[in-house]
């Protein structure tokens, strides 16, 4: 799928086109949710993703990205989504969320996202605070599979 946007931008879900270095740099250096995430972990997550969507500028370079983790039985999680600073303020984040959540193979599923700063953006796509029964378990690095005997 390639979807063309105004201003020469386009969205593409071809995983071979994703600039892994650009994704790693943003997640590791700039994001609040994945700060200092190791490169091998980023690569593992990209390989295991249900869907990757790249946002590309007029020059063809990656300028935004989303990663979906999905269980086709009924749940999709919007794990990483960003638009690089020079490209913000043009509605590109809205289009990236729309492509990720409302189009593609997981559009019909229940979606979850965890965000500290984009509640209004996600509310435009029907995201609401979860029901009170939703529970979360914090990450347990001590139980990471690579550390088990």
What are these model-derived regions, one by one?
Residues 1-37, 146-149:
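Short amphipathic alpha-helix that is part of the acyltransferase structural core
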Residues 42-59, 63-82:
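A conserved beta-strand-loop-helix scaffold within acyl/acetyltransferase catalytic domains
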């Amino acid at each position: 799928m390639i979807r063309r946007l105004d201003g020469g931008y386009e969205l593409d879900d071809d995983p071979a086109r994703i600039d892994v270095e650009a994704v790693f740099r943003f997640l590791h250096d700039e994001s609040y949710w994945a700060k200092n995430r190791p490169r091998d972990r980023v690569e593992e997550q990209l390989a295991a993703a249900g869907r990757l969507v790249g946002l590309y500028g007029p020059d063809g370079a990656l300028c935004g990205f989303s990663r979906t983790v999905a269980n086709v039985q009924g749940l999709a999680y919007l794990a990483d989504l960003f638009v690089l600073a020079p490209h913000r303020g043009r509605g590109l984040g809205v289009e990236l969320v729309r492509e990720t959540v409302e189009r593609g193979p997981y559009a019909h599923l229940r979606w979850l996202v965890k965000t500290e700063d984009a509640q209004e953006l996600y509310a435009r796509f029907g995201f609401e605070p979860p029901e009170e029964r939703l529970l979360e378990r914090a990450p347990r690095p001590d139980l990471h599979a690579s550390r088990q005997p």
